[in-house]
């Protein structure tokens, strides 16, 4: 894959990247794609997968757990534990 393709993917939203990745998987599963094209779209799929993983990781890092006092009222937030 070219750097242009990676740059193109970097601008994708999570939803757009997942939709294209699903399309690639469907094409590869059908088996009606020439070998060279299969390799090319597989490589693009790998880039899309990595992009989705990075977006999910960034979102996970932004999520906070709300702390409650004894009465159950919110008193602040802290980073979500990674289990």
Curated annotation (Swiss-Prot):
Write down the InterPro entries for this protein, in alphabetical order: Exonuc_VII_S, Exonuc_VII_ssu_sf
How is this protein named in the record? Exodeoxyribonuclease 7 small subunit
| Quaternary structure (record) | Heterooligomer composed of large and small subunits.
Enzyme Commission code:
3.1.11.6
Stretches that traverse the bilayer: none
**Reaction equation(s) it catalyzes:** Exonucleolytic cleavage in either 5'- to 3'- or 3'- to 5'-direction to yield nucleoside 5'-phosphates
**Class of enzymatic activity (EC top level):** hydrolase
Per UniProt, subcellular location reads as: Cytoplasm
Q: Name one GO cellular component term.
A: cytosol
């Amino acid at each position: 894959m070219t750097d242009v393709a990676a740059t193109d993917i970097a601008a994708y939203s999570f939803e757009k990247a997942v939709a294209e990745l699903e399309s690639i998987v469907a094409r590869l599963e059908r088996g009606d794609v020439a070998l060279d094209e299969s390799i090319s779209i597989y490589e693009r799929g790998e880039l899309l997968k990595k992009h989705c993983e990075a977006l999910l990781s960034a979102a996970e890092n932004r999520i906070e757990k709300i702390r409650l006092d004894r009465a159950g009222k919110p008193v602040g937030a802290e980073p979500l534990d990674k289990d």
